[in-house]
Amino acid sequence: MHITSADEAIAEALRVIGDAQPRCGATTVVAIDGPSGAGKTDFAAALAERLPDAYVLHMDDMYAGWDGLEQAVTDLHDQVLAPIARGERAEYRRWDWEHDRYAQWRTLPTTPLLLVEGVGSGAGRGADLESVLIWLEADREVRFQRGVERDGEAFLPHWQRWAVQEDALFLADATRVRANLIINTSP
């Protein structure tokens, strides 16, 4: 299903999530994926406001810098989703973007609903443990402008490097094709 209206998108996502069955132990995992600047973080926040039992995990906390996309996809499965599926504690090492190094370990609370938002959240081996995949997209120029507004001038040197990683991941994984919902966030 392709959606463009924000209210319609939230309503449809809530419907799909409500119908979903857990595939990660007792936890229903919702991946909110798509390229940078598509609006995944804002969309996850809007869903979380309406889903009080949900915990939001941001992939930005898992990327080991600007070249860490592929490793973060693996870490999402190995450190978060697989342990949850086994009924174990999930924890991951947060990336400190300011100091360009790993920071403290974070432990996820036990939750019936986990929203994982960010590039790569619906890719890789973790996809088998996710109940819902929501894909957000926007025109490249719109996404670029949002990225600059969000991250400032510091983002510019990294935009193309990151975009190459995104494109390779999404092509190899066919992430968009597997989505339960596709939402275009372009104005």
Provide a role label for each language-model segment.
Residues 101, 105, 123, 152-187:
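Small-molecule kinase domains that catalyze NTP-dependent phosphoryl transfer to phosphate-bearing small molecules
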Residues 1-29:
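Extreme N-terminal, non-catalytic leader segments
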Residues 104-151:
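ATP-dependent NMP and nucleoside kinases share a basic, alpha-helical "lid"
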Residues 43:
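Hydrophobic positions on the alpha1 helix immediately C-terminal to the Walker A/P-loop
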Residues 55-57, 62-114:
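Conserved nucleotide-sensing/catalytic segment adjacent to the nucleotide-binding pocket
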Residues 35:
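P-loop (Walker A) phosphate-binding loop of NTP-binding proteins
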Residues 40:
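Conserved lysine of the Walker
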Residues 32:
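Hydrophobic anchor at the beta1->P-loop junction of P-loop NTPases
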